[in-house]
């Protein structure tokens, strides 16, 4: 616990120096970090191999094991990501607006760093670098707490990044990692209001729930993606098939993958057998409502019946829940009840249904005739993101550099006093 406090203090102190660094100074630090990661690749892969062996011994497999794995190519991609962040414009110091009051006061809004940010995340070593780099570019220091599965990889990456900071002449306390992965230490970190200005959890539903229930530090919820694709009665079947297959199977272990398929009852008899066969051919397990099970059975397809828990579940795997709905209103009601406010899609040729879906579905990103897989900072055109916010304050959707800053009001006077 003392180690946690000491590292939090270092991060807080470093934040005071980072906030006034120039864009060139921050970019040089990021460039040094990228070079160090490439130089120390063998060491990083060696430490990652320890995590992989531990994970296999614990029975971790499939998409979860893949998310933990680092390779030479993946490390090169991480470094390419750093170079991409270097190219992004620095939001810090931007004057958003300025106006003059009748009394002569000139008031402006200026973008400034948030300060010291805590990140709690699960078994994805790339997040260690992504989070640190984005926080630094936005002028913030960062206290990282990864999952136990990736502890060797994460500690190695932070060690190497600190070497890059020192080479660039930047305070090494700008990046710290909590090596104690116990639940007790994580909960203690959630209460470090004295040192942390913001806490961002990245992971599954249980992690997000734990943070929201225990944190006294302000939190931005990210990541849980119980995403739906609703195929409306007017949908083009080929388009719908392509969107569903992509949303579910392209990368099933990410938060913007589709977890549920809703199909309008008027097309269920014709569309369901086709899409279920296509999904099963891709290795997807189907968990259907009673109507889905009945239609599939008539067509010689055996599928598992879904439980109530299935409708709430983010699988992060080749599993999908399938439900037949009576109308677009029923689809919207289902999504707003069971969804996680992340990304939702409708496939339709009906303009009014498309607009209704956009207006009434409560989510950070709502799609018409496109895959949910596009909810991503790069795909949205504003570069890397630290996560997908599923709440409405202070940020919503992909969180890029601007979302890692806040507003400061600057006021110029000439001796005005209030009467």
From Swiss-Prot:
EC number: 1.2.1.41
SUPFAM superfamilies: ALDH-like
Gene Ontology cellular component terms for the protein in this record: cytoplasm
Gene Ontology MF terms in the entry: glutamate-5-semialdehyde dehydrogenase activity; NADP binding
Catalytic activity: L-glutamate 5-semialdehyde + phosphate + NADP(+) = L-glutamyl 5-phosphate + NADPH + H(+)
Entry keyword set: Amino-acid biosynthesis, Cytoplasm, NADP, Oxidoreductase, Proline biosynthesis
Stored CDD domains: ALDH_F18-19_ProA-GPR (cd07079)
Any GO BP annotation: L-proline biosynthetic process
Major localisation: cytoplasm
Pathway this chain belongs to: Amino-acid biosynthesis; L-proline biosynthesis; L-glutamate 5-semialdehyde from L-glutamate: step 2/2
Stretches assigned to coiled coil: none
Similarity comment: Belongs to the gamma-glutamyl phosphate reductase family.
NCBIfam families documented for this protein: PRK00197.1, proA
Name of the protein this chain belongs to: Gamma-glutamyl phosphate reductase
Organism: Caldicellulosiruptor bescii (strain ATCC BAA-1888 / DSM 6725 / KCTC 15123 / Z-1320)
Gene it is expressed from: proA
């Amino acid at each position: 616990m003392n180690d946690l406090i000491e590292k939090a203090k270092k991060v807080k102190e470093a934040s005071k120096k980072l906030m006034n660094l120039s864009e060139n100074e921050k970019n040089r630090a990021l460039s040094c970090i990228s070079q160090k990661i490439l130089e120390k690749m063998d060491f990083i892969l060696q430490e990652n191999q320890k995590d992989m062996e531990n994970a296999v011994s614990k029975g971790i497999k499939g998409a979860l094991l893949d998310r933990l794995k680092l390779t030479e190519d993946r490390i090169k991609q991480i470094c390419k990501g750093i170079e991409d962040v270097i190219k992004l414009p620095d939001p810090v110091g931007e004057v958003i607006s300025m106006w003059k009051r009748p009394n002569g006061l000139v008031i402006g809004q200026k973008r400034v760093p948030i300060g010291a940010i805590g990140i709690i995340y699960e078994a994805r070593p790339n997040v260690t670098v992504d989070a640190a780099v984005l926080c630094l570019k936005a002028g913030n220091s960062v206290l990282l707490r990864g999952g136990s599965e990736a502890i060797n990889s994460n500690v190695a990456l932070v060690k190497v990044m600190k070497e890059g900071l020192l080479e660039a002449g930047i305070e090494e306390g700008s990046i710290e990692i909590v090596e104690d992965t116990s639940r007790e230490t994580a909960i203690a970190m959630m209460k470090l209001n004295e040192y942390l200005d913001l806490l961002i959890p990245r992971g599954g539903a249980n992690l997000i729930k734990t943070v929201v229930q225990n944190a006294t530090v302000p939190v931005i919820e990210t990541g849980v993606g119980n995403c739906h694709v609703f195929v409306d009665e007017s949908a083009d079947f080929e388009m719908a098939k392509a969107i569903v297959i992509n949303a579910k199977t392209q990368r099933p272990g990410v938060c913007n993958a589709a977890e549920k398929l809703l199909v309008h009852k008027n097309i269920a008899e014709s569309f369901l057998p086709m899409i279920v066969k296509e999904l099963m051919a891709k290795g997807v397990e189907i968990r259907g409502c009673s109507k889905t099970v009945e239609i599939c059975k008539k067509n010689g397809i055996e599928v598992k019946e879904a439980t109530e828990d299935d409708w709430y579940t983010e699988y992060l795997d080749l599993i999908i829940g399938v439900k037949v709905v009576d109308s677009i209103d029923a689809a919207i009601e289902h999504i707003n009840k069971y969804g996680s406010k992340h990304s939702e899609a409708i496939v339709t040729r009906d303009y009014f249904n498309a607009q209704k879906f956009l207006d009434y579905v409560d989510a950070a990103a709502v799609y018409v005739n496109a895959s949910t897989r596009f909810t991503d900072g790069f795909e949205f055109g504003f570069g890397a993101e630290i996560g997908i916010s599923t709440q409405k304050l202070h940020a919503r959707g992909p969180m890029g550099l601007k979302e890692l800053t806040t507003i400061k009001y600057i006021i110029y006077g000439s001796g005005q006093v209030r009467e």
